[in-house]
Amino acid sequence: MLRLLFGFLVTCFLLLPARAAEPQYAIFAGGCFWCVESDFDAVPGVLETISGYAGGKSANPTYEDYAKGGHREVVRVKFDPDRVSYAELVGVLFRTTDPTDGDGQFCDRGFAYTTAIHALNERQAMDAKAEKIKAEAELGRPIVTPVEGAAKFWPAEDYHQDFGKRNPIRYWYYRNGCGRNRTVEKLWGDRAYAGVSH
């Protein structure tokens, strides 16, 4: 009887669904946060994106003053690590930007629009550096995107969130007028937008 009960309990335990991994976060700068948000929203396994500011010294930055405070435009990405790895997300950042440009991105110039990876822990820093080495080998030229430590994330104003979804025509004109897709496709060839499903 005990053996039967034990067998039943083991079977019940084995039939329990596996516990899903806790969502994780990443913070990436890739130029205009409208575009970065739109690209990462199209990555399977990404649960949420929020546009914002990070890396500067000023508190509570706004769109009017974030650059003066030393911040970049960034996107905080919430993701399911069972579906997409942090390393894969770093690869998406590289292949949706021009990480060889240290002066901005596309038509947006200046430090506030430069690329950066804010690693939130040592594991993320290691993965980001490894992906950077791979991407440099693939391009055959240096990538200037720095891997920096964690920085306080400040969400941008509501009107910046999901901008491409809420303002598709204005967004399309901005993205195409800025030359983002054209430049990324010229730089990366058939690897442009790898990992993005739109």
UniProtKB/Swiss-Prot annotation:
Domain of life: Bacteria
UniProt key word Oxidoreductase: yes
Alphabetical list of Gene3D superfamilies matching this protein: Peptide methionine sulphoxide reductase MsrA (3.30.1060.10)
Keywords: Oxidoreductase
Pfam families in alphabetical order: PMSR
Biological process per Gene Ontology, one example term: protein modification process
GO molecular function, one term: L-methionine:thioredoxin-disulfide S-oxidoreductase activity
Enzyme Commission (EC) number: 1.8.4.11
Tagged with keyword Protease: no
Reaction(s) the record says it catalyses: L-methionyl-[protein] + [thioredoxin]-disulfide + H2O = L-methionyl-(S)-S-oxide-[protein] + [thioredoxin]-dithiol; [thioredoxin]-disulfide + L-methionine + H2O = L-methionine (S)-S-oxide + [thioredoxin]-dithiol
Active site residues of this protein: C32
Family from the record: Belongs to the MsrA Met sulfoxide reductase family.
UniProt function note: Has an important function as a repair enzyme for proteins that have been inactivated by oxidation. Catalyzes the reversible oxidation-reduction of methionine sulfoxide in proteins to methionine.
Protein name as catalogued: Peptide methionine sulfoxide reductase MsrA 2
Organism of origin: Rhizobium meliloti (strain 1021) (Ensifer meliloti)
